[in-house]
A protein has these predicted regions:
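Short, exposed coil/turn segments at beta-strand boundaries within extracellular/luminal domains
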Residues: 16-25
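Surface-exposed, short loops/turns at beta-strand junctions within beta-sandwich domains
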Residues: 2-7, 120
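Extended non-catalytic accessory segments flanking core domains
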Residues: 25-213
Length: 213
């Protein structure tokens, strides 16, 4: 059987409340699904998690040389410090929707003051030079410093996986864009007044009452 996808188009003739007819079109593609495979960043994360020497690198003052076997790897920019909320951070990954497929880069060049939207636009493919990279975990988030980022010309659409609360709470999708559906604030937060000058947090639950942590 052919591995090439087959495409068909269905046409529906419908009637509105005034009796007027109109058409709706539905395109259906049939073919062999090829699941995503672990990419270069995913393999890097696997190396970090499997390296017992790096387990003690907690906090920037305990950063350790990465000493990865690959001097350069390819990645996609997932997010930058456009609004100053990701202070000096650049989020990069394989952009395949898999768990453990992204990591945070930390450095002064990624700061909002250096116009990261122009220099490091989300969706752009990049090459990461890891020869002098150092690793540490900050608040349980995996980070690299001293990474040289070369931005390419190719831009791709970001893959945003939809997660259950259980999957999100594992922490395996850190540094990635994700989507959670049907989330609502806990009842204790409903109707609560907010002020722009206060730091506040909200507990979110899914439709079954499971809490996002």
């Amino acid at each position: 059987e052919s591995a090439q996808p087959h495409m068909g188009r269905l046409i529906f003739t419908l009637s509105n409340s005034y009796g007027e007819l109109y058409r709706k079109y539905l395109t259906v593609t049939q073919g062999n699904y090829v699941p995503p495979t672990v990419g270069a960043v995913g393999k890097l994360v696997e190396y970090i998690l499997g390296n017992s020497d790096l387990s003690g690198a907690v906090g920037s003052d305990k950063a350790m040389p990465l000493q990865y076997s690959e001097s350069t790897i390819e990645a996609v920019i997932l997010a930058n410090d456009a609004a100053g909320n990701n202070n000096r951070k650049l989020y990069v990954g394989d952009n395949n929707g898999l768990e453990r497929s992204a990591i945070v880069l930390y450095g002064a060049d990624f700061a909002m003051a250096n116009d990261p939207v122009t220099k490091y636009p989300a969706g752009r493919k990049v090459t990461l030079n890891l020869e002098d990279a150092k690793y540490y975990a900050f608040n349980n988030v995996r980070q690299l410093t001293d990474v040289v980022v070369t931005v390419g010309d190719e831009e791709v659409e970001l893959v945003v996986p939809s997660l259950s609360v259980e999957k999100f709470n594992t922490g395996d999708y850190q540094a990635q864009y994700v989507k959670l559906n049907n989330m609502t604030p806990a009842q204790s937060f409903v109707g609560k007044p907010w002020t722009a000058t206060e730091s506040q947090s909200v507990t979110l639950n899914d439709a079954s009452g499971k809490t996002l942590t």
